[in-house]
Design a protein with these regions (language model features):
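N-terminal positively charged helical leader segments and presequences
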Residues: 16-17
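Long, low-complexity, charged/polar intrinsically disordered regions in eukaryotic proteins
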Residues: 22-37
Length: 151
């Protein structure tokens, strides 16, 4: 009988670890640090796929410090400034934020609505709250709107 139980789980985990790529190992290490309640001091190698506009928005998300938040409007103003524009739509920025497939490492949970409303997280507002609490963000002024998702 050569069952998993008789071989021990160590063999299973060892084979799994041997098959992981360096990129996956780095991402796993980042996630382990993050979910232990500490700020990772590195960003694993990322290759998000999206339009030039989405890439620009996601780059701004990576600049939001651990435990802090910003608004869609602030991101729109920063992006407009970087691109030499007078105005950028917060809704357009919100759309790009919403298409972020690496939503934990590229921290879209740190973006809130204009009036400190907790809106627009693909994993659900309850998860957004938990992630911000894990980062020890100051949650006093935030609220979950009863209707709408004003950016």
């Amino acid at each position: 009988r050569d069952s998993v139980a008789s071989r021990g789980l160590g063999d299973v985990y060892k084979r799994q670890a041997e098959s992981e790529t360096p990129v996956l190992c780095e991402a796993k290490r980042w996630l382990d640090i993050y979910f232990s309640g500490r700020e990772p001091d590195f960003t694993p190698p990322l290759h998000p796929v999206g339009s030039a506009f989405q890439q620009a928005v996601w780059a701004l998300l990576l600049e939001i410090p651990y435990g802090e938040t910003t608004t869609y409007g602030t991101l729109a103003r920063k992006l407009a400034e970087k691109q030499g524009l007078t105005h950028m739509s917060a809704q357009a920025v919100g759309g790009a934020v919403g298409h972020n497939d690496i939503s934990l490492i590229i921290p879209c949970h740190r973006v809130v609505g204009a009036s400190s409303s907790l809106t627009g997280y693909a994993g659900g507002v309850d998860k957004k709250i938990k992630l911000l609490e894990l980062e020890r963000a100051d949650m006093k002024s935030f609220f979950v709107p009863k209707k709408g998702t004003a950016l």
